[in-house]
From Swiss-Prot:
Molecular-function GO term, any one: serine-type endopeptidase activity
Entry keyword set: Cleavage on pair of basic residues, Cytoplasmic vesicle, Disulfide bond, Glycoprotein, Hydrolase, Protease, Secreted, Serine protease, Signal, Zymogen
Family of this protein: Belongs to the peptidase S8 family. Furin subfamily.
Biological process (GO), any one: enkephalin processing
The keyword ATP-binding is annotated on this UniProt entry: no
Reactions catalysed, as given in the entry: Release of protein hormones and neuropeptides from their precursors, generally by hydrolysis of -Lys-Arg-|- bonds
Identification of the protein by name: Neuroendocrine convertase 2
Pfam families (UniProt xref): P_proprotein, Peptidase_S8, S8_pro-domain
Amino acid sequence: MKGGCVSQWKAAAGFLFCVMVFASAERPVFTNHFLVELHKGGEDEARQVAAEHGFGVRKLPFAEGLYHFYHNGLAKAKRRRSLHHKQQLERDPRVKMALQQEGFDRKKRGYRDINEIDINMNDPLFTKQWYLINTGQADGTPGLDLNVAEAWELGYTGKGVTIGIMDDGIDYLHPDLASNYNAEASYDFSSNDPYPYPRYTDDWFNSHGTRCAGEVSAAANNNICGVGVAYNSKVAGIRMLDQPFMTDIIEASSISHMPQLIDIYSASWGPTDNGKTVDGPRELTLQAMADGVNKGRGGKGSIYVWASGDGGSYDDCNCDGYASSMWTISINSAINDGRTALYDESCSSTLASTFSNGRKRNPEAGVATTDLYGNCTLRHSGTSAAAPEAAGVFALALEANLGLTWRDMQHLTVLTSKRNQLHDEVHQWRRNGVGLEFNHLFGYGVLDAGAMVKMAKDWKTVPERFHCVGGSVQDPEKIPSTGKLVLTLTTDACEGKENFVRYLEHVQAVITVNATRRGDLNINMTSPMGTKSILLSRRPRDDDSKVGFDKWPFMTTHTWGEDARGTWTLELGFVGSAPQKGVLKEWTLMLHGTQSAPYIDQVVRDYQSKLAMSKKEELEEELDEAVERSLKSILNKN
């Protein structure tokens, strides 16, 4: 498949984003969903038009004048366009545009079968929830957990926070979920009704969302199943996965559903993790995400949590446009002894990790949570289980400080996540140019709920975010079969302009490249401060030789806090012994961050923390720059 930007970088609600389009050699699939724009009139007019032509209708909350029409008399998926219905709408003088939605695959992630702290819970599975409090259960490593006990003891349990589970529905009648279910914030986009109950199957395949919901919001001390990470939070069901094919309208509607009621959206799904797919959000979904981080939660921004992917060493989550988005917090997983799970994908866009299973046959090494029809399970797994745990931790932080923005949450994640006893046999732990420790698979470490709520209490909103095109290489360059193509870009990060970026958050390398075998490409980028990010690692199952990457935005978080000014280096080469050919057609450097120091005004309570180290670095840099300005002033006067 192909993803890329079909237009220039667009300004949308104050953000730059890339409009991706995707092409496939397979025949397209057409659904019974239509995107309709009217010449004028509001929802009443849209309902009238829809009714006259046999459609149901929903207004799209993130786009003025656009409507979601659906026709229950049409097949949900077929190979031919419904030209009759499309033309019927287009002939109506009130209709400006009607576009039948194509379907595409989205897969659930990780659906597999497989007491030192004085926290007393009577829930029968609580002692098996090692990811909450790890005392060595199932041969785990004591102390390797989310440190929720400290957050709970400080009084934070997620009260006043709502998490939306975007999935195959949730069993909202489950006795461990019913008291925390937020019906007002829930919706079924698969059936277009307000009841997101899972569709029954003999194999209980649609238990995925219910399991995720229990990890976040299962009630405490009710003698049922286990305990949610944020057990006093509310959970909303957004049923959107259970149809033959996904559409842009359904994704966009789900991501933008009730953004003033839902604080955190948890997604344990994405493009197929087969090691050869390159895919991401379409135009409406990108628009909805941009709208969410700008306008959600009263302007503080919706918080999107994404499972990084289950393709293992055969895949790279930078080929997933959801997990690698700047607007999402991408979460990987570790097992209960700190090792990587066999299905873990690695990439430079992953921000942090939580826990799941993935190596051990012991059933108690899985994630204990709620299951369909009032049941419980010990067998939830994959990064599907990791993302809801993170959503629960973020709910605890929001209870500590409801004023946190979507970017504040990312900064808190970077600063409070810990290496703990995580172990990656492939990628070493390294420090970036400002001393922040990271790993290519685990990101900045495992979430620490206690540390996060304590820092969140005192947190001051980070400075305004700016975006700078740091430079671009547009001349085609051949990639040698052996050795590497090495290119450099020297940038001032827009210094002296309104959009100057001094302290980095996210960096994107927008790349167009073709190769005789896409899966053998390896791409690294090194910052001016010497931090190397692996933008793309080998994907042995990817045999593409025609499509390549078309303006694909590879993203890294590994240069967080660094100074973007200076020379950036891009290296492209092939892994493997077979002769190869390739051409790099474009490399554009996109810098995102702040002009002023983000941590200089923060309260430091732990002088051994990453915050203390980062603040010290900022103060020294501010002093150096002040001295330099004074010297220049003196020299100019003389």
